[in-house]
């Protein structure tokens, strides 16, 4: 029986799943907006939000903890220098998931995942 087993499998091995969400979280922190399938977006929330909470308190131990989970120096640097201070007063809810219709090839539900309170660039508004 599958009682108390939280999280989606996505038809991948645990190592593949872990690497996928590690890469997605790093991309989210770098670009602050990514497009993915809706189930992956909902599962990414469980990975990215605790990392932002860790990024709110800068220190060697927290940086090492974040690097152990992300394995991306650039993303960890931005997490502590830019994102942590930005969300210092926010007690959670750092991500916004916006539904974006269905993918043309397989009709999978798509979604945008973005960081709340991200600076909007003028050229993005023009789109």
Swiss-Prot record:
The keyword Ribonucleoprotein applies. GO terms for molecular function: structural constituent of ribosome. GO terms for cellular component: cytosolic large ribosomal subunit. The keyword Ribosomal protein applies. It comes from the Bacteria. One of its GO terms (biological process) is translation. It holds the Pfam family Ribosomal_L17. Signal peptide: none annotated. Keywords: Ribonucleoprotein, Ribosomal protein. Gene3D superfamilies: Ribosomal protein L17. InterPro entries: Ribosomal_bL17 (IPR000456), Ribosomal_bL17_CS (IPR047859), Ribosomal_bL17_sf (IPR036373). Belongs to the bacterial ribosomal protein bL17 family. Part of the 50S ribosomal subunit. Contacts protein L32. This is Large ribosomal subunit protein bL17. The lineage of its organism: Bacteria, Pseudomonadati, Pseudomonadota, Gammaproteobacteria, Lysobacterales.
